[in-house]
Amino acid sequence: MALAYDGAIQRLIDAFGRLPGIGPKGAQRIAFYMLSAPEDEARDLAEAIEEVKAKIRFCDICGNVCESSPCPVCADPRRDRSVICVVEEPKDVMSIERTREYRGLYHVLGGAINPMANVGPADLRIPSLLKRLEGDEVKEVIMALDPNIEGEATTSYLTQLLRPVGVKVTRLASGLPVGSDLEYADEITLGRALAGRREA
């Protein structure tokens, strides 16, 4: 039987351990840091978590995170409404925004097709994307999904689905490492991939 800490400290370690990218040792380090941190720092963290759960929602139009819907991008009249960039997660929107190369709109799918994790097309925000393409305002859809197996499968699926709609479907140019996440791409590489996009 594995040894565990007593009560509240083990509960905190377990809670941190459920966060993505944090293993058991990292969770233990964070928990013990919080134990020795000033009380106001621990309170600030707890309040920030409660506040984000209470205030943050998903944009009714694009699926990005926001405090009120529509999000600032969808509400901005200066954005190019003829182009929609499709991404997996809200964090990908920020990665592309940091490049300062893109002035269109976004559509956040909420993931990618992944049969191993039981995520299929029905689990993604695909119907709302199709609804946004019903008019003739959108001329191009940019597939900016992670360059991994799941992202490629989702790009392929969406390209086939969108072909009959009559919009131009493009994808980011090469330059992003295969198997990586957009979140970790530097602004210059991502900006060049966006500027050099090609037909899907």
Curated annotation (Swiss-Prot):
Record GO terms (molecular function): DNA binding; zinc ion binding
One record GO biological process: DNA recombination
Zinc finger (C4-type): 59-74
Gene3D superfamilies, alphabetized: 3.40.1360.10, 6.10.250.240, RecR Domain 1
Keywords carried by this UniProt record: DNA damage, DNA recombination, DNA repair, Metal-binding, Zinc, Zinc-finger
Function in brief: May play a role in DNA repair. It seems to be involved in an RecBC-independent recombinational process of DNA repair. It may act with RecF and RecO.
Name this polypeptide is given: Recombination protein RecR
Lineage: Bacteria, Bacillati, Actinomycetota, Actinomycetes, Bifidobacteriales
Encoding gene, per UniProt annotation: recR
